Amino acid sequence: MTSWFDIHSAIALLGLVIYALDSHTRRKRRHPSAAIAWFISLLLLPYVAFPLYLFFGRRKVELAEYQHKKYTHAKDSKQSEINISSNEKLARALGLGPSVKFNNLNIHKDGAQALQALEACIANANKTLDICTFIFGRDESGYQISQLLAECAQRGVKVRLLIDGFGYYLDGLVSFKLLKQAGVEVAFFAPPFKFSLLGRTNMRNHRKLVIADRSHLWSGGRNLSHKYFQDTASTKKKQWVDLTFNFDGALAQQATIVFEQDWAFATQKAIPKKHNTATHLSAQQTLGVRLVPSGPDRSEDTIYTMLISGCYTAQDHILIATPYFVPDPTLLTALELACHRGVRVNLLVPESSNHVLADIARRFALRDLAQAGANIWLSPSMLHAKAFVFDDTLALVGSANLDERSLFLNYELMVAFYESRVIQDFSSWIYRQQHAASLYKPRRAGMWRELAEGLVRWVAFQL
């Protein structure tokens, strides 16, 4: 007679074998915490973990599945190679596109200005308008934006709206019937209940971008929902403070390529040939902006790598604004070592975020970083901005949170700014938020609190 232990062992063994084969044959480099969590879960709770792994276990997609545009850089002479900055060398090694010039940068001081810039972007589109968002709200702002998109399509502009398949359920189920009737193309990225996407339903598209005529880009951390634009003191609810920007320039063309790839993956259609050919770049540097996409469609974890590099190369200061702070041990150590080297590290997070588990998971990292000498500021608002500044040499601003889900699982999009004047503008934005924040004071955690924090950190890669 077969015992319960035999059945348990058989299922656990099957799960571990499939996990090992899947990771090896697909060459999936998993983060250590994720690998350990999957291994222990499959060993102890195979009945739960095995089905979850089949649905959520994949971390990278093959390039054959996800049609990918490649950049190759011209070979530099020995003399010019000496003059190339370390940031440029790293970007090339990661296969990122070129740094390009930009014009008319507008860093939105609040939600009202962000919405005004978005409305202008939609209204001024003449040929194409591509929008990617994690959440499209069933609310006042969502309705207002829908009306503008419908009007845009009715005047002959090709309008495409890409919404994450999971994010669609988070802020009310919006009906897009009227938009489609107006001529707007609507697609959902990896819907969670689509069986053909088995193993990929955990890959969320967290990118936020609006591209008009492949020449104007609106991007940052805001979703297209009312609370992301209502951050004035007049509101009775807790303010959501976010950071977006817009500008003109060639970077919008690079963003279009990323959108085309995401759209093709969501609709299962081929990318137009003009957007899917290898691009050869000259060796010349331009001190401007660079698109930094990251996610399952990239062989490297680009944003994570740039953050690690920034921590180790910073000489004077590091500024971070993020809603969730659940770094992996490597990134936390890099920040602590920066403190020990005398680098001024300032971290701005909300006093309490909209994710209770993320707040519990962050406690250990906050205590350790504060003890290393960092200044940690607690914003009374629901800070949703994502910005990382390293000296006056690099600012990364966009959609990525400082947690393992954003850095290792989600499709994310950041913009790297290299001009010191612009970097100082983003620094000033963070400092303004700090003025309303209180300084974090670490408290010693008891045994039960540490146990609870440890259990939550065990699944931190899924938060």
Q: Over which residues does each language-model region extend?
A:
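N-terminal localization/anchoring segments of enzymes in phospholipid and broader phosphate metabolism
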Residues: 1-304, 309, 353, 367-371, ...
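Short catalytic-loop micro-motif centered on adjacent basic/acidic residues
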Residues: 130-131, 160-163, 319-322, 348, ...
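Conserved small/aromatic sequence motifs within transmembrane helices
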Residues: 138, 300-301, 320, 327-328, ...
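Residues at the starts of beta-strands that form the adenosine-phosphate
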Residues: 154, 158-159, 317, 343-346
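Long hydrophobic segments that form regular secondary structure
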Residues: 307-317, 340
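Helical hairpin unit composed of two closely spaced alpha helices linked by a short loop
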Residues: 324-345, 350-351, 355
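C-terminal structural cap/anchor segments
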Residues: 343-402
